[in-house]
Amino acid sequence: MKQTIKLLKQAKTIALFSHTSPDPDTVGSTLALMKILEKMGKKVDVFCAETNDKFAYLECYDRYSTDETAVLNNYDLLVAVDVPDQTMLCGFEQAFLSHKNTLRIDHHTKGNDYARHNICENQSACAVLIFEIAKKLKVKIDSETATLLYFAICGDTGIFKNSNTDSVTFRICADLLDFGADFKKVYTEFFLKSTLEYIKLSSHILLNAKTNDEYGYVVMRVSKSDYDKYNPEQNENISNLPNTYLNCGYKIAVIAKEKEDGIHCSFRSKFEYDCSAVAAVFGGGGHKNASGCLIDASLDEAVSQISNAVETYLKSI
């Protein structure tokens, strides 16, 4: 942590990076760190390979740039926030790796130490580290920053339902509420809102899931044609649909989503099972009960490979 604080204090111009397929933790943590550093008088820009309108209600989300041609050598320091693997920087990867002064702030202990400097602590969310950094920098957290950090923590803890939720998480969130975090806005705008098209697509996916009662797992699939047929808004996320089957008693549930660059897979598991071990088979990872990976195969092939990997894992424990 001392080295991290030193780097952030010394740099005058800083570029922050979130991971591709952005989630609440990478977005909330990155934007919160941006605001903290700007309070110190730093010039800060934020980058991500892609954006998602689902986060547009956040007041400073429009600060993100997707310009992968940006000249990153002009910055004193590049910081990857909640990015466990350099490939999740996408088009920014090579420029990041070639920069002389880089920092990775992360809570994925199974990630890669690809930056020149790495701080990685096993916390419920990367936002916990950003909160601690703000304290070390002696920067007062305002209501907007508190809302961003609260949003980030809610995302990675599943609104405090996931097994990574601990007493530290609750203590920090209590502090964030005292600082003015708008928990009602976070819950209403991000976790509650939906559309009829999304509900129809979700129903289709759930009803056509492949269940295996012998080993206790489920694999769901969504094809490009499913997206075209039901046409949900781009900002709606189906990655948490597997939780529905966990609530029915299944041990592990997976959803495989057909995209242009391959099959994006989201894994969820009950507390006592480690779905990250399955995701790791395909070069992915994440958390014990919530992980992901990208498979370069057809949708049918990916579903078959996932089923085999899940069965192999469940047989081994």
List each language-model region with its residue ranges.
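Conserved beta-strand scaffold positions in the cores of enzyme catalytic domains, especially
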Residues: 102-104, 117-119, 217-219, 255
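General beta-strand structural signal in soluble alpha/beta enzymes
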Residues: 16, 46-48, 104-105, 141-143
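Solvent-exposed alpha-helices and their adjacent loops that cap or buttress functional pockets
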Residues: 70-72, 94-97, 111, 141-143, ...
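Active-site cofactor/cluster-binding pocket
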Residues: 61-116
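Short alpha-helices
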Residues: 105-172
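Glycine-rich, phosphate-binding/catalytic loops in enzymes
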Residues: 33-34, 95-98, 120, 171
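Generic enzyme active-site microenvironment
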Residues: 17, 21, 80, 104-105, ...
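Hydrophobic helix-and-loop "lid/oligomerization" segment in the mid-to-C-terminal part
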Residues: 2-20, 26-56, 63, 71-75, ...
